């Protein structure tokens, strides 16, 4: 399937605008995975990360459904359902990613830090911007670009967990519980 050239233009425009700003906001949150933050449940940082991400996603894709799934003692996850568009009549697609981070290392170059997003020479620096935080923003931006171009896409389900950096101990449980809805 070839895509209209305006899809790529739309992605580039979004990436340099709202998507980049959303990713910068994500970098600012020290959303360390539970293995690195024993207070993850009481401090609410992982949940806040999902709330902020869902808010950004709702602005981008108002037709999508965003649900934060919480269970005591288990890091929260964000489940998303994006309705089919353009009359697509195929099987649904499933995207996975994570929005938790490893601890901040030492040794940042001058002017850079883990929780301070900086664009330098066309590159974005900050903790979580490449492993795997960008995935959330890229996935939703790509779907939006398809819709703006009038391209068809299947129903899309996404699961973004906050425990990948600690081994994804509860990922199988989340997928099993969500399977009837996918």
Task: Specify the residue positions occupied by each region the protein language model found.
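Secondary-structure boundary motif
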Residues: 59, 145-149, 176-180
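Short alpha-helical patches at coil-to-helix transitions and adjacent helical residues
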Residues: 50, 132-136, 168
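Histidine/acidic-residue-rich, glycine-tolerant segments that coordinate divalent metal ions
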Residues: 153-182
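Short, small-residue-enriched loops and turns at beta-alpha junctions
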Residues: 42-43, 133, 163-166
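Active-site metal-coordination/substrate-binding segment of hydrolases
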Residues: 89-160
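Gly/Ser/Thr-rich beta-alpha loop segments that engage phosphate groups in nucleotides
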Residues: 32, 128-130, 169
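N-terminal helical capping/dimerization or prosegment-like subdomains
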Residues: 2-105
